[in-house]
Amino acid sequence: MTRCISKKMLLEVDALSLIYSPHLYMS
């Protein structure tokens, strides 16, 4: 169960990094 949660968290972090990385490169 904890493995499932951590995997989901990693996916969410991945999505967030994809969303925020362009902003970081632009500034």
From Swiss-Prot:
Domain of life of the organism encoding this protein: Eukaryota
Protein's name according to its UniProt entry: Uncharacterized protein YJL136W-A
Organism: Saccharomyces cerevisiae (strain ATCC 204508 / S288c) (Baker's yeast)
